[in-house]
């Protein structure tokens, strides 16, 4: 998926007011990973999706080729709005995908 142009980046907040993606990002002990993920989000904002793939139920996976194989899960809530759902790495990928799908369904049920 390659798009050029400005994309609005938003972060999913649970019904309990928890920003799941931000909580995960700041908990990373690998500071280089933190920087690389932050840069990918900035690139995403400019329309550069790079290495990503669709999963299911409208959830996508943004892959960061560093360390543990970090992933950022997101959904598109419009043509120009990306909702960051959660993150993880290759080791927790299956669980993270299930969480991301549940978060996106929750978001759509509450917001859309």
Regions found by a protein language model. Give the residues of each.
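Basic, Lys/Arg-enriched alpha-helical interface segments
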Residues: 1-68, 78-82, 89-112
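Short, surface-exposed beta-strand/loop micro-motifs that present aromatic residues
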Residues: 71-75
């Amino acid at each position: 998926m390659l798009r050029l142009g400005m994309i609005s980046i938003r972060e999913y907040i649970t019904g309990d007011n928890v920003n799941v993606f931000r909580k995960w990002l700041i908990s990373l002990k690998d500071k280089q990973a933190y920087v690389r993920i932050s840069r990918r989000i900035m690139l995403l904002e400019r329309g550069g999706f790079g290495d990503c793939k669709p999963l299911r139920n409208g959830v996508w996976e943004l892959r960061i080729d560093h360390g543990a194989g970090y992933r950022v899960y997101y959904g598109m809530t419009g043509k120009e709005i990306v909702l960051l759902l959660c993150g993880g790495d290759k080791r927790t990928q299956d669980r993270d995908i299930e969480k991301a799908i549940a978060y996106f369904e929750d978001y759509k049920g509450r917001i859309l």
